[in-house]
Amino acid sequence: MTAVIAPPLIPVGKIKSFGAFGPNYEVGRALRQLDDGDWLVDIKMVETGETAEYRMTHILDDPEAR
C-alpha cells in the first residue's frame, strides 16, 4: 500500500523576493516532494513571467516583497 502525502500549506499567490534585494516572484502550486522531504513549488517571476521550480524551504525563508 502506498501512502498519500499531502503537500504543505503553500502561500499560493503571495509575492516574495529572493532575499532582501532580489527580484520578486509569485508563489504557485506544489509540484512534488523531494527525497529529503522538502517540496518543489512552481514560481513565476513578476517582471518577466518566466516560471521555475523552487524549494519550499527557500520560499519560507524569503521575505514578502515590498
Write out the residue ranges for each language-model feature.
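A cross-taxa feature marking solvent-exposed loop/turn segments within ectodomains of secreted
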Residues: 34-36, 49
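Short acidic/polar mixed-charge low-complexity motifs
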Residues: 21-24, 48-50
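Residue-level recognition of conserved beta-strand positions in structured domain cores
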Residues: 29, 43-45
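Short aromatic-glycine-enriched beta-strand elements
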Residues: 37-42
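Intrinsically disordered, low-complexity, charged/polar segments
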Residues: 45-66
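A short beta-strand micro-motif
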Residues: 11-19, 43
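Short beta-strand-centered aromatic/proline hotspots
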Residues: 23-32
